[in-house]
Amino acid sequence: MAERADLVFHNKAIDGTAMKRLISRLIDHFGMAYTSHILDQVKTLGFQQATTTSISLGIDDLLTIPSKGWLVQDAEQQSLILEKHHNYGNVHAVEKLRQSIEIWYATSEYLRQEMNPNFRMTDPSNPVHIMSFSGARGNASQVHQLVGMRGLMSDPQGQMIDLPIQSNLREGLSLTEYIISCYGARKGVVDTAVRTSDAGYLTRRLVEVVQHIVVRRTDCGTTRGISVSPRNGMITERIFIQTLIGRVLADDLYMGSRCIAIRNQDIGVGLVNRFITFRSQPISIRTPFTCRSTSWICRLCYGRSPTHGDLVELGEAVGIIAGQSIGEPGTQLTLRTFHTGGVFTGGTAEHVRAPDNGKIKFNEGLVYPTRTRHGYPAFLCYIDLSVTIEGPDILHNVNIPPKSFILVKNDQYVESEQVIAEIRAEASTLNFKERVRKHIYSDSEGEMHWSTAVYHAPEYTYGNVHLLPKTSHLWILSGVPQRSSIVPFSLHKDQDQINIHSLSAKQKFISNLSLSMTNDQVIKKLFRSDSSVKKGGWVLDYSGPAEVLCNGHCNLIYSAILDENSDLLAKRRRNRFTIPLQSNQEKEQKPRSGISIEIPINGLFRINSILAYFEDPRYRRKSSGITKYGTIEVDSIVKKEDLIEYRRTKEFRPKYQMKIDRFFFIPEEVHILPGSSSIMIRNNSIIGVDTRITFNIRSQVGGLVRVEKKKKKIELKIFSGNIYFPGETDPISWHSGILIPPGAGKKNSKESKKLKNGIYVQRITPTKKKYFVLVRPVVTYERADGINLAALFPQDPLQERDNVQLRVVNYILYGNGKPIRRISHTNIQLVRTCLVLNWDQDKKGSSIEEVRASFVEIKINALIRDFIKMDLVKYPISYTRKRNDPVGSGLIPVNGSDHTNLNPFYSKASIKQSLIRHQGTIRTLLNKNKECQSLITLSSSNCSRIDPFNRLKYHNNMIKKSNKRDILPPIRNLLGPLGIIPKITNFFSFYYLITHNQILVKKNSQLDNLKRTSPVLKYYLIDENGRIFNPDPSINMILNPFNWNWYFIHHDYCEETSTIINLGQFFCENVCISKSGPHLKSGQVLIVDVDSLVIRSAKPYLATPGATVHGHYGEILYEGDTLVTFIYEKSRSGDITQGLPKVEQVLEVRSIDSISMNLENRVEGWNERITRTLGIPWGFLIGAELTIAQSRISLVNKIQKVYRSQGVQIHNRHIEIIVRQITSKVLVSEDGMSNVFSPGELIGLLRAERTGRALEEAICYRAVLLGITRASLNTQSFISEASFQETARVLAKAALRGRIDWLKGLKENVVLGGMIPVGTGFKGLVHRLSNISLEIEKKNLFKGGMRDILFHHKELFDSCIPRNFPDTSEQLFTKQSFTRFTD
């Protein structure tokens, strides 16, 4: 040893890693014995110092970091903004999760970095600081949890809980934080126990597989090797050195013509350094993979022993060492897990900040727009980008590395220290990336819409899985789906309006509907047209048969009309819609009275048409049957003018006016079945109640069955009643189909009591000779005075000169003897009381045949009234119908001109005329104040509106502020038809006031802007086809509702721009659409009115390309249904507790990623591809070789990755020995001609090759990957197998097969108490082995062929190496060229 004076003196703190280096160098220089002596001295020194220091730890030593408060606040602020963006639909769930993780992770990391300087400055001798930062006890992560913040936790699956724990353990946790903390830490505590046993079991299995592998020869004579090349940057230098040191070269290595190293030379540090400096050609090394021996290994293929730096000794049990070296770190590391307590760890990106204030410039051609991982718009640069920032007095140049995100636009002004770019963190080999599926579930019930085209996923062409081609929103439009089990089909046609109480809504949704609606949300009348407009790309489809949607949050599907105290049912049939009225009080008193007002779609009433009708519940039946008027003749053809037209599609049928006191109804049960259905009862048989008729239909009454076939259907009727077999003299026998009214029977007969209701006699002849009489019960309906409908329309006291009259008429809806069919669960209305409209003809003879009716809504401050308005007026607008017009009649000015002619009262003279001419009627529909329901009649002469004067002053000021450009013009009288003031673009919005007193208000104040704007009368007309006549004076367009632009008039002042709103448009949260400020909820515009919108609330979900959408467009989703599935990459938690299962999965050859294919499947694919390329016999042999080599390298890399991520160094050799055992078997396939092995038998690869050589014919086999468990059960020794698992089965099989155990392994010998063939016990075997010569046989046909294939078809060979192996980027042996395949 050198003198002390010559030694270098280091004055440094030595930590763990420095200590490791020191020891390794000491061993290199001085050898083992001397090193141990030095280490003893170090140990003694350490213990002395620790004793004198005597560190103790108290709670006061935990000092919280001062900057923590504002850091946490800042992070909370960012999370809040993020949450908002998510609600607005700007970021999707995965982006939100990622970003919240990164926000909190960055905060936590920053606190962690602050910790050390903080301790150093405030209290350097703090025991916590000394202990943790010296590496003696505890680490930074634990101290950080004590004094910083606990941060994000991962749940037991290694997923992230996105609620961070902001407190540290010194401050104490809140209840929620404590629970989350336990949830995460449970993994630490419980799993440490569980995983320790796991790790032990893993070690046991590993040792089991390789226990028989012992070094038994010096050289096996193989010429194969695996080439490792340092040239490509995939392998880091450190890994490269680790791979090479201790190996043996498989081939001579030349540098130019000079040989640097020869075959079979072992590689030391010096040689490796020369390789790195020279960067010569790929280096071929021997590995356990290439060793030719079947069940052992040779010294040269193994290399140097890990214990001393020389070649491994003969007789060394390298298998057991390998198993232990892989299993042991697992046990160690599981014990080490609890220190983090489940705290999540991940990586963040670096940022580039602006050096100074100024304008930023870069070349826009070199970047292209993209979206960052957090959903922000950014530019991605492919190459180095030079960015200049023009400061106030200096130009700054910043270089941005390739693949970075630029977060600002070109020419944007940036502030100093603003983040301008984000450098992508290099995908380090330490964290795993795995592709995960994340399902997004719906928060609410509703109907699904998406705003872009979607593709069907190819494998689900007929399913409901769609792929998104571009980023777009999915919308869930709110609505309560109705789950109806009873109705097999819906009564409601597409686009019908449905009442909440409608018949098919069997469950009562009424209870949980809060029909709270504010006034501006009252839904306007909008009846969509029948045909969908295909051209514009809108298809309004009906979402299934029995789904009825209704919802209480004022979001009515298909804009059903609702108000606070009435449910209006608007059913739109082909040519009319009806609105039944009902008020709250009425609801409580009696079942729903169906007073309905009918208005034809074109809004035109003829004389004597029905205005309203009432369906009396007393005349309602639940069963099918026949109406009879009895013996009384019915005048079905009444006087011409009394005949009421009732049009239906094409069929014209009169309603039978009722002039009789009573009529009869004969009930019967009818089932109409498809022709193919099997009926379980016979014709003319008699059945009881609840008899099964078909598979799923049961009868509701008992009686006689009649079955008739009609076209393709079967009509099955069940008649209830009594059966008589009359004698021949009995008079009843001659009659069939006679109705006997009550009291007509003989007084003395027994039946007289039964005849109270009357009977119906029907003769039935089942066969020619037999007949009997069926006596059926009859229900009698007496004529009742229907509710006096006219009373519901009280005459207004001011309306003495009203010219509209109403009559009440009762109608029977079905003819004499007409069968009535009941369509699933509806009621049949037999009698309808109708209100017929009539009006006086004008005295001058200008007869008005049609009256136009429409709805008007009038506001009185906060009160809203709806009216039916009838105008006895011929408007200056005619209805035209174009042939190809899909929507129907539209409003078009008579002469097509846009402006002046539409104004009928341009001069004062015309105003007077129009007042006389335009008399009309308005009747209210709803009355909120009175208990009785009244419809007030108003005529145009006494209905006018007043503007609120108090707001005028305010607007006056407004105008003064705007430079007095518009001084208020003089007020002038204006009255339009029906007293409606034309609303010209004015400075304020109207409030409507209704007055019944003509004298009170004669003048209407209105800003006279007629001369300045185009003088067009501003009608607001929606005709019931959904056509709109646009009330904006400057634009006269006819818009159909599907692309319905509405110009929102901002009444405050004219300079303000107006938003364009389309019907059906979707709004995200917080979009400004009105002057009152941003709209707070997201939704879809349902109805647009002059001064209000109705928005159906909806929730947007953002989805990016490649996401999978579940469900169809317009499908009804329930809460918690899966909406979208995102596939995204996430870095796996670097905790070994998650790592160990990964190791185990690889070794057991189970699938690893949740998405990537199984390793086994991959091997199959390989086999097929190569066989296809090379033809059968060669294909099998080479295929098996290549497949096995390929999968071996992949497996080694996968396992190394887990351990390296934990900073554990395991030499590749150990893993290779294990992997060699997993992959050393092949499966004999049926294609072989030889009878040596049976198909499906597992044999060793080398054995298969040798047998093939001996037989001189090819054995066909393919590679399989066995897991370690299967490999342990497929060894050559049945004793070893039996001692591992399934003892009885293994021994029984071995006995039946007559297997022989050659006792080559360790375990068999231990079990039988023999000498184990390793170490000294091995020496006895050596003399037996020395006779075996290593001479190489002469090359036979196969080898020559093999060499030819591999060397003369280089490109073919390359094409076989797959490009799609998952880990190729980080593969250690990136070139897997086998230098030679010949032996």
Curated annotation (Swiss-Prot):
Pfam families: RNA_pol_Rpb1_4, RNA_pol_Rpb1_5. Its EC number is 2.7.7.6. It is found in: Plastid, Chloroplast. Keywords: Chloroplast, DNA-directed RNA polymerase, Metal-binding, Nucleotidyltransferase, Plastid, Transcription, Transferase, Zinc. Binds 1 Zn(2+) ion per subunit. The keyword Nucleotidyltransferase applies. It catalyses: RNA(n) + a ribonucleoside 5'-triphosphate = RNA(n+1) + diphosphate. GO terms for biological process: DNA-templated transcription. GO terms for molecular function: DNA binding; DNA-directed RNA polymerase activity; zinc ion binding. Zn(2+) binds at C220, C291, C298, C301. Transmembrane segments: none annotated. InterPro entries: DNA-dir_RpoC2_beta_pp (IPR012756), RNA_pol_beta''_euk (IPR050254), RNA_pol_Rpb1_3_sf (IPR042102), RNA_pol_Rpb1_4 (IPR007083), RNA_pol_Rpb1_5 (IPR007081), Rpb1_funnel_sf (IPR038120). GO terms for cellular component: chloroplast; DNA-directed RNA polymerase complex; mitochondrion. Belongs to the RNA polymerase beta' chain family. RpoC2 subfamily. PANTHER family: DNA-DIRECTED RNA POLYMERASE SUBUNIT BETA (PTHR34995:SF1). In plastids the minimal PEP RNA polymerase catalytic core is composed of four subunits: alpha, beta, beta', and beta''. When a (nuclear-encoded) sigma factor is associated with the core the holoenzyme is formed, which can initiate transcription. This is DNA-directed RNA polymerase subunit beta''. It comes from Ranunculus macranthus (Large buttercup). The lineage of its organism: Eukaryota, Viridiplantae, Streptophyta, Embryophyta, Tracheophyta.
